[in-house]
Amino acid sequence: YKIPTGEFHLNRCTALLNMFLMATYGEGKYVEAYHDQQIYLNHKLLEQKQLNLTEVQEKSADFLMQFSGVNEAYSAHRLLLGSWTPEIYRIRNGYHRKRSGDLVIDVLPGWTIVSENGNENKVVRHSYIPAPLIFMGHSVKPAIIQTPVTIDHIAPTLAHFMRIRAPNACTSAPITDLR
């Protein structure tokens, strides 16, 4: 099988994005920082040049989509106000509007995200990897459950066992087959 793979260098990507924005809007350092597939734009420079942040984010996302290995590029505006799909839902759950970047890059499966700053490289995998989920405790009966469980079932299940209210952000029901 010939699965398409490659290396995605985020530092090179941000350098090219900054050059694209300079060609479009004039001189300046538009990309302030990047970390963990997120790109942070220089908001002070955008305000100084009286540029619309949403427009710059959308143009940047469209430009990033042209890179090899990029599956999707999401702007902060699209994540906060866009339509809900399973892919956006997964990324939206890890997004915080005050701390996360202006652009989030989703790399194709099989591609390696190369970190020039550190020594760790991240291989992107979107395939299902089965792993056991084990609950142990006084009132937990031994059982094997055949229903699929996602990570967002864990917090409400633990709260259910401890007989406390589930966290406010819980969207899933607890696993009740264990009692």
Identify the function of each model-found stretch.
Residues R99-S100, L108-V140:
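C-terminal, low-complexity/hydrophilic appendages and adjacent surface loops
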Residues Q50-E55, I145-D152, A169:
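Soluble non-cytosolic domains of exported or imported proteins
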Residues Y1-W111:
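Secreted, luminal/periplasmic, and some membrane-associated catalytic domains
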Residues I105, L133-F135, I154-A159:
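Beta-strand elements within well-structured catalytic alpha/beta cores of enzymes
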Residues M65-G69, A159-P167:
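Sec-exported extracytoplasmic/periplasmic mature domains
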Residues K44-L51, K141-T147, F161-R163:
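Second-shell loop/turn segments in exported
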Residues I164-D177:
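C-terminal beta-strand edge segments of enzyme domains
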